[in-house]
Amino acid sequence: MIHVTCNQEAFELPEGASAMDLASKMKNSHCFAGALINDQEKDLSTTLKDGDTVLFLTWDDPQGREIFLHTSAHILAQAVLRLWPSAQPTIGPVIDQGFYYDFANLSISEEDFPAIEAMAKAIAEEKLAISRQVFSDKEETLAYFSDNPFKIELITELPEEATISAYKQGEFLDLCRGPHLPSTAPVKAFKLLRTSAAYWRGDPSKESLIRIYGIAFPTTKELKEHLHQLEEAKKRDHRVLGTKLDLFSQQSYSAGMPFFHPRGMVIWNALIDYWKRLHQLAGYQQIQTPQLMSRELWEISGHWENYKENMYTLTVDEEDYAIKPMNCPGCMLYYKTQLHSYREFPLRIAEIGHVHRHELSGALSGLMRVRTFHQDDAHVFLTPEQVEEETLNILNLVSELYGTFGLDYHLELSTRPEQGTIGSDDLWELATEALKNALVKSQKPFIISPGEGAFYGPKIDIHVKDAINRTWQCGTIQLDMFLPERFDLKYTNPQGEKSTPIMLHRALFGSIERFLGILIEHFKGRFPLWLSPEHVRIITVADRHEARAQELAKYFTQQGILATVDQASESVSKKIRNAQNMQVNYMITIGDKELETQLLAVRTRDNRVLNDISVEHFTNTILEELRSLSLTSSL
């Protein structure tokens, strides 16, 4: 017999029992997609060992949902091959909003979707068992996939000692590390969304492919809710709203490099000002490092060897330079300008750095995927014993920042990869436990992604949920044991000896451009007052009211309220509609009555009207709304 733990309860099972055997002892086991066995994602068919700790995953868990969607991608590929046997499947990953699969030798349109969806439904109803198969070596794998050059390329690049697995359902077998659902049966609702052109490995010089996007759910009800969400997302598209609200534009002369307009810069500056205040109070010092630095620096950091294809490089006076794709190396150089003692730690250094990374043109998308952006990085230098407390400090900062925007989030801890890491086992264990303990103390929901950390340390990713329940990966907290060693950073420890510091690299907004895009969609362009590009628009009834309107606008501006006067020769109702379309928070109408009483007629963008408001009361109310960073109107 073996003994395992599940949900802090002990179970006794016969030798050779699987996670599925354990699941049979649980309620609602039909909902289980997979399992975390000793924090490793596994299939339910996995054989358990004595002492294992098991946690079952469902659709409601991010890892369980990914397993479900990955199986759905395989169902898509199987359905396509049943209908077009000559098609060549390439890759089919899970993405934020579902999954896609790329095919070569296939020509279809959305008119073919009903046939594919019907076949996918049939595959699910066949309740095909899904099993994991491990090939004996690369030669066997290459022989099996000999008619698919794309799979051959992927297999050839694998290390000789790699374990190569595939998943089989019915007649279909595909390369995959898994895990997968135990059968196709749980996929009750399956919908294809769109097709697009793609290139093998995203490289325009390689083969053209067709990409089919899809989504799947355990129930039809959830699918209907998701399709409604997609319709709502179209209304919130930041690219459309960015144009309509005159916030930013894109130019063909600089693909992937947005132009911010004056109204967009108001929001930008509000974000930056808030960030600076928050970090000053949290004990951060701000620096600025150059955008252009020599090849020698990037060789020390490792970027020249491992990231050069994503960097913009040039030669000046016969010396190679690169525009920085990341802020970290510049901060390392700043650290070395002074001697440091453990008494200074944690030493918190922040920078809003302007970085450039080459993205393929097909991957560019509004503010979400660009070639130039500003990253709100900070590097915290500390001793190993300080990691847990400082991580908790950062998590508290995360909570305050995202709470200010009304954004909920969850956290993901990525642990040590199986191979290719630096640092001792003891240091990895200490670092991982410190991050995990800080997450527990933060009392925010988090998941563990085993083996998904960087080679130089574990990390915490911050996944933000917007107003229509989409998630976006924004901030990150990365423990780095690599760069301090590469740059030979030192501090004097309590024994008076030189030691290498641990470094926490963290970003809260992540890309500020991307975060702004998320905010545009989250608020649907209806920004809270403190972020709004136009707080007040003053509307005159006739020309004789112009002087009073200008007087008020000047006064409000002096008080720190962004106010404009609509001088257009249009009706009052048209001016009001124009202001509401531009999502101006408050409109003030000046007519004969207001001129006489010196009081205000105020209208909100929600069309609530408040008459006879004194200038003093309105000003004080608006200033308090701005000061408090309120998400709702004060009037």
Curated annotation (Swiss-Prot):
UniProt cross-references to Pfam families, sorted A to Z: HGTP_anticodon, TGS, tRNA-synt_2b, tRNA_SAD
Catalytic activity: tRNA(Thr) + L-threonine + ATP = L-threonyl-tRNA(Thr) + AMP + diphosphate + H(+)
This protein's record includes keyword Zinc: yes
Cellular-component GO terms for this entry: cytoplasm
Renumbered residue ranges of the record's region Catalytic: 237-528
GO molecular function: ATP binding; metal ion binding; threonine-tRNA ligase activity; tRNA binding
Cofactor: how and how many bound: Binds 1 zinc ion per subunit.
Compartmental location: Cytoplasm
Key words, A-Z: Aminoacyl-tRNA synthetase, ATP-binding, Cytoplasm, Ligase, Metal-binding, Nucleotide-binding, Protein biosynthesis, RNA-binding, tRNA-binding, Zinc
Known EC number: 6.1.1.3
Matches recorded under SMART domains: tRNA_SAD (SM00863)
Domain TGS residue range list: 1-58
Obligatory cofactor(s): Zn(2+)
Residues bound to Zn(2+): C328, H379, H505
UniProt-listed GO biological process terms: threonyl-tRNA aminoacylation
Protein family membership: Belongs to the class-II aminoacyl-tRNA synthetase family.
Function, as annotated: Catalyzes the attachment of threonine to tRNA(Thr) in a two-step reaction: L-threonine is first activated by ATP to form Thr-AMP and then transferred to the acceptor end of tRNA(Thr). Also edits incorrectly charged L-seryl-tRNA(Thr).
Oligomeric and partner information: Homodimer.
The name this protein goes by in its record: Threonine--tRNA ligase
Species of provenance: Chlamydia muridarum (strain MoPn / Nigg)
Gene name in the database record: thrS
